[in-house]
Amino acid sequence: MPELRHITSSALDELSREAFKSAEVERAAIVVLQGARSWGAHERGAITLPDDGGTLVFPVSYDAREAPYTVDEQGLERTLISLSDEEGYLACVWARPCQGSSLVGVGIDLASPRDFDTSERGRRLTELMFTDAEHDLVNATFSSNLPYGYAVAFGAKEAAFKATAAPLRTWYRSHTEELSYDLRHFSLVDPHRARGEARDGTAQAALDKMGIARIAVQYVEVAGMALVVATAFNT
């Protein structure tokens, strides 16, 4: 089994504090692991994470959108969880909200600047994923490193989209109306404050129906990639 490395840094600690500073949670953590997927930290059925010198094991299932979720012995989804893997790294954010907490969803994404380089594939991806306004934002804010800027902007979309997974599952437990939206309907609107929000009417209408009042995103650089965490709140 390949050696597993737990990535720690003051930047990741600060990211966790910022992501959950306005959320009432019993516990929450952002974990980044380096190693091949095959070493077993993440398998279809469970994820094992380092925790204060020991380990935590979450039983993991996947919904119709392939979003991971975990339930306790009573079959209740008390812990919110999201996963992302990229270039040999696995990132996880999990949180156990207090009763009555406004936190309803979490999302995480590792986005590589290599996907947004000057190659033909990179150019096609940026054209597909971003509006003119988003191109202007990235060019104005990340002019010295455009591929990283696009990775941040893409990671914000993906993480925000993932943060709606738990509210969407809750919606379908009592509704038959299909809510249709994708990650392109979200946008990083303020890279200095790292705010994310729904961009168009389709996504906003879905968020309103699910009771999501706001989605915040935070990001740091990890191994040259953008690590973005999103938190969804109902107030």
Positions of PLM-derived features:
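Core catalytic alpha/beta fold that binds nucleotide/phospho-ligands
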Residues: 1-235
